[in-house]
């Protein structure tokens, strides 16, 4: 359902039934990677190949997957569930996510249904829902940061939110 390239050669594609594919040759060939057991039957809907040390993906069921470079293993080979606590003390977001945007090595933003926009500043340990002026009837489809401070969230019924303060 999504693909993200770090450079002209290295890319990750994700999809139905926990599918994760990795390419080292610009997409000419793809190799399967194992999704975490908890996500093996999930629809992975968005992927961000952020850097040589980190990549994140999300499922439509509110799960966040993370791949980090380890001693002798490049990013994209091993995937783990990102367990986190939201402000309500929950260990699962419990929302249908639609997109993830990586702003820095440790900061990412999430969008979803029912007016859901959230941010993590610590790599996903704590996820904080953001206050929005539109109420909970707007579904957000995508969020992108233009630079370190300015970003746009796009939602249902032509909704468009801008931030000038990093989310």
Task: Cite the ranges covered by each PLM segment.
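Residue-level hotspots at or immediately adjacent to binding/recognition sites across diverse folds
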Residues: 1-167
């Amino acid at each position: 359902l999504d693909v993200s390239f770090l450079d002209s050669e290295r890319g990750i594609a994700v999809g139905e039934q926990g599918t994760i594919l990795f390419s080292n040759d610009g997409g000419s060939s793809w190799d399967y990677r194992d999704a975490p057991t908890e996500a093996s039957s999930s629809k992975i809907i968005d992927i961000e190949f952020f850097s040589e040390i980190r990549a994140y993906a999300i499922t439509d069921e509110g799960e966040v997957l993370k791949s980090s470079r380890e001693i002798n293993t490049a990013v994209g080979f091993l995937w783990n569930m990102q367990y986190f606590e939201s402000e309500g003390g929950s260990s699962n977001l419990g929302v249908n996510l639609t997109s993830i945007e990586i702003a820095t090595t440790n900061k990412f933003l999430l969008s979803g249904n029912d007016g859901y926009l959230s941010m993590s500043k610590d790599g996903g340990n704590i996820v904080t829902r953001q206050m929005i002026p539109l109420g909970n009837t707007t579904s957000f489809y995508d969020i992108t940061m233009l630079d370190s401070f300015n970003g746009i969230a796009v939602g249902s019924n032509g909704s468009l939110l801008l931030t000038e303060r990093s989310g």
